[in-house]
From Swiss-Prot:
UniProt keyword terms in alphabetical order: Chloroplast, Plastid, Ribonucleoprotein, Ribosomal protein, RNA-binding, rRNA-binding
UniProt keyword annotation of Isomerase present: no
A Pfam short name: Ribosomal_S3_C
Alphabetical list of PROSITE patterns matching this protein: KH_TYPE_2, RIBOSOMAL_S3
One Gene Ontology term of the molecular function aspect: structural constituent of ribosome
Family: Belongs to the universal ribosomal protein uS3 family.
Subcellular location: Plastid, Chloroplast
A GO BP entry: translation
Xref: NCBIfam families: rpsC_bact
Domain of life from the UniProt record: Eukaryota
Major location category of this protein: plastid
Protein name: Small ribosomal subunit protein uS3c
Length: 218
């Protein structure tokens, strides 16, 4: 049987870069990793609680963390930064305070920057949130997948594959449904592929959404 590998980790150092940039002593490594997870969860929870657009999407494509001895630099790549920047200084400061409180970092400065990404629907995380929103509103899964593919086509991508697994439409037996448009060369390391897996809780149970987007050939 073919073994599935995470397309992002498979391409690290060629077409993908690390989302966390820092060094640590081997014994301290796990602490740094836990800290990163806390930061990411804290930001996502803050955005979920305070900023909601009609479709219920957070619009975060990715969060990059760079650490130095006296500074933690966090860059949030958002598809719809208006959500966080409407009353910008106050919102960002509030988020900074929340993260600082969560981390309890006294001797390190925390800096948060927000970057807008063009073509938000060309990013799998934002697309997965869109599909999750549709499934929660009981839209048929095929309709949701086709709509997602239409949105990515507007973002000038070369190919997309969407997979939904679980008790689809409340059926007794769980199954996997997928749809592909264009090319998605998972075996080619030079192919820049964006990927995300997303869990959505519907009234029928938990569904898993996986999205592969073929952005460009290096």
């Amino acid at each position: 049987m073919g073994q599935k590998i995470n397309p992002l980790g498979f391409r690290l150092g060629t077409t993908q870069s690390h989302r966390s940039l820092w060094f640590a002593q081997p014994k301290k490594y796990s602490e740094g990793l836990e800290e990163d997870k806390k930061i990411r969860d804290c930001i996502k929870n803050y955005v979920q609680k305070n900023i909601r657009i009609s479709s219920g999407m957070e619009g975060i494509a990715r969060i990059e963390i760079q650490k130095r001895i006296d500074l933690i630099q966090i860059i949030i790549y958002m598809g719809f930064p208006k959500l966080l920047i409407e009353d910008k200084p106050r919102r960002v400061e509030e988020l900074q305070m929340t993260v600082q409180k969560e981390l309890n970092c006294v001797n390190r400065k925390l800096n948060i920057a927000i970057t807008r990404i063009s073509n938000p629907y060309g990013h799998p995380n934002i697309l997965a949130e869109f599909i999750a929103g549709q499934l929660k509103n009981r839209v048929s899964f095929r309709k949701a997948m086709k709509k997602a593919i239409e949105l990515t086509e507007q973002a000038n991508t070369k190919g997309i594959q969407v997979q939904i697994a679980g008790r689809i439409d409340g059926k007794e037996i769980a199954r996997v449904e997928w749809i592909r448009e264009g090319r998605v060369p998972l075996q080619t390391i030079e192919a820049k592929i964006d990927y995300c897996s997303y869990t959505v809780r519907t009234i029928y149970g938990v569904l898993g959404i996986k999205i592969w987007i073929f952005v460009d050939e290096e």
